[in-house]
């Protein structure tokens, strides 16, 4: 069994990205700029945002956090996004989710111009992804693809079971895997007997946020296991995932830990996406 060490891979990619950004900056060009919008004070979002900004600063991306009270008028938030869209010195705009309950998240995600949609959630970028065109890909799905590639795990002709069909992870990841010639089975909350769909899978990717939904009896020997879930165990207070790691690892060939697997790959992919958009903006302005 080999641990898919997202923390280690992300650290190396971080060094590579820092070097790429330095080359532009040494030529006298501006640094890439990422703006993060946060509405309200969700505790988990506070942690995620502070980490994203920390990593951005470490690789040489200028980051700005715009905080808004949960009672901000919806029109005011739209206007701010539009203002950022028109700022030529901004390369990426990230809307930290979740928004307060009375905000329709999709409306604000679609308000971000596709050329600054660092999360790859705009319907134009999603449509390009669907058709297999070059575009900005959602961070967690692309991070997973990159992690598999780092360990020379091909998805071509593999039977892959994906559990969880969110717009952020499951749906885009399923499409990206299809575009890479994998055979995909997608399970949602209404799927009966998930084990029937996982037991013969070469690769299992679980993104439900439900603790230990994947157990050792549900996988075949030497399966590859990707755990996207992250939950705090109410008993031990430790972070765990969808997968019963200690037991499943004994049967799998490769497996991601929680934490230290998919999470670090998501963050570095966000930075890489910001750099991709930055390069496009810089080249366009020449």
UniProtKB/Swiss-Prot annotation:
PANTHER family: C-1-TETRAHYDROFOLATE SYNTHASE, CYTOPLASMIC (PTHR48099:SF5), C-1-TETRAHYDROFOLATE SYNTHASE, CYTOPLASMIC-RELATED (PTHR48099). GO terms for cellular component: cytosol. One of its GO terms (molecular function) is methylenetetrahydrofolate dehydrogenase (NADP+) activity. This is Bifunctional protein FolD. InterPro entries: Aminoacid_DH-like_N_sf, NAD(P)-bd_dom_sf, THF_DH/CycHdrlase, THF_DH/CycHdrlase_cat_dom, THF_DH/CycHdrlase_CS, THF_DH/CycHdrlase_NAD-bd_dom. It comes from Mesoplasma florum (strain ATCC 33453 / NBRC 100688 / NCTC 11704 / L1). NADP(+) binds at residues 164-166, 230. It catalyses: (6R)-5,10-methylene-5,6,7,8-tetrahydrofolate + NADP(+) = (6R)-5,10-methenyltetrahydrofolate + NADPH; (6R)-5,10-methenyltetrahydrofolate + H2O = (6R)-10-formyltetrahydrofolate + H(+). It holds the Pfam family THF_DHG_CYH_C. Pathway: One-carbon metabolism; tetrahydrofolate interconversion. Homodimer. Belongs to the tetrahydrofolate dehydrogenase/cyclohydrolase family. HAMAP family: THF_DHG_CYH. Catalyzes the oxidation of 5,10-methylenetetrahydrofolate to 5,10-methenyltetrahydrofolate and then the hydrolysis of 5,10-methenyltetrahydrofolate to 10-formyltetrahydrofolate. Signal peptide: none annotated. CDD domains: NAD_bind_m-THF_DH_Cyclohyd (cd01080). Its EC number is 1.5.1.5, 3.5.4.9. Keywords: Amino-acid biosynthesis, Histidine biosynthesis, Hydrolase, Methionine biosynthesis, Multifunctional enzyme, NADP, One-carbon metabolism, Oxidoreductase, Purine biosynthesis. GO terms for biological process: L-histidine biosynthetic process; methionine biosynthetic process; purine nucleotide biosynthetic process; tetrahydrofolate interconversion.
């Amino acid at each position: 069994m080999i641990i898919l060490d997202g923390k280690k891979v992300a650290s190396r990619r971080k060094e590579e990205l820092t070097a790429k950004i330095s080359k532009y900056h040494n030529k006298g060009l501006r640094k890439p700029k990422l703006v993060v919008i946060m509405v309200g004070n969700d505790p988990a979002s506070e942690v995620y945002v502070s980490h994203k900004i920390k990593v951005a600063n470490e690789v040489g991306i200028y980051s700005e956090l715009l905080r808004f009270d949960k009672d901000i008028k919806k029109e005011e938030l739209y206007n701010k996004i539009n203002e950022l869209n028109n700022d030529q010195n901004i390369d990426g705009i990230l809307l930290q989710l979740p928004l307060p309950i009375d905000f329709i998240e999709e409306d604000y995600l679609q308000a971000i111009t596709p050329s600054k949609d660092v999360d790859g959630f705009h319907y134009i970028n999603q449509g390009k992804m669907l058709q297999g065109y070059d575009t900005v890909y959602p961070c967690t799905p692309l991070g997973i693809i990159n992690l598999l590639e780092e360990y020379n795990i091909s998805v071509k002709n593999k039977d892959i079971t994906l559990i969880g069909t969110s717009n952020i992870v499951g749906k885009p990841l399923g499409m990206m895997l299809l575009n890479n010639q994998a055979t995909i089975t997608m399970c949602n909350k209404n799927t009966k007997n998930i084990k029937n769909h996982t037991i013969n899978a070469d690769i299992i990717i679980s993104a439900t946020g439900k603790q230990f939904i994947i157990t050792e009896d549900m996988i075949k020997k030497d399966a590859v296991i990707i755990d996207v879930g992250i939950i705090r165990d109410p008993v031990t207070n430790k972070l765990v995932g969808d997968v019963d790691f200690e037991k499943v690892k004994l049967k799998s060939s490769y497996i991601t830990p929680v934490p230290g697997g998919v999470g670090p790959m998501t963050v570095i992919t966000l930075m890489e996406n910001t750099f991709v958009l930055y390069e496009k903006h810089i080249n366009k302005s020449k």
